[in-house]
Amino acid sequence: MLEVGLIFLPLAVHAGLGLRTLAREKLKYGVPKHHHGSDLRQWLQRMSAVIMLVFVLFHLLTMQRWLGGRFDPQHAFSSASGAIWHFWRDLPAAHPVNVLFAQLYLIGLVAVTYHVANGMATGAAVLGLTRTPAAERRLWVICRMAAPALLLAGVVAWVAFAVD
């Protein structure tokens, strides 16, 4: 129940608000009322949100046991690897469909990394947590350093699953 209250509920609220914004403003490039960052960053934020939502839903359906997924906490690595590489259970791991889904996981990982890093810095500016331009720049530096490190960690984990 802890994961529902601390993970799923906040993500569901964030996704719901994001979908409402997306329905209202679409994926158009260059929204004039946006004051924190470039139009490209805002557009990439929306695109990464759509990709990330599909990725998270797919991930939940393939991993979570209570949704029929294959993940087993007692055998975390092998069951996660099996869930990624054997999306279609009766197909071999090297089948093009399974390879495609493994690549989509990598695309989802990139989208999540960008969305979180950009969202943290932009959100802090919008909420007034970075009160000066210097504080905003420092936070951007931290996010720009953390994002590649997180992406590298994710890619290394993905490669570990890929060579299993």
What is each of the regions a protein language model found here?
Residues 1-164:
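Membrane-embedded alpha-helical bundles that constitute the cytochrome b-like, heme-associated redox core
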